[in-house]
Amino acid sequence: MKNLIAILLLAVTLFSTCKKLEIEEGTPNCIRSKISAFEKDAFCSDPQVDEYQFQSEYVYVFIDGSCGADLAATVFDSKCNIKGRLGGIEGNTKINGEEFNSAKFIKTVWKK
């Protein structure tokens, strides 16, 4: 009986510590990998990754969250090439010389 209880407690502990990231279907594999690393390294409690259509391609904006006023969001293309950074202390609003406000929001692909 003691062995059964010990096994059940171990199983409950293992299953409760395993947390699968809920990433939207269709997200490129390299972006999924970046999200996994981003989730582990995030220092804000509310990071997220949003998908946009911008300059004839899909891009992914990695937003650190709201715990700092001057945090920059990194923009990647679907092959994980950095397109640029938005915001930050300099308040950048352009990627490749074009205002990012022309981007079309598609969806949030991951949120902590």
Regions found by a protein language model. Name each.
Residues 14-17:
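C-terminal motif of bacterial Sec signal peptides marking the signal peptidase cleavage site
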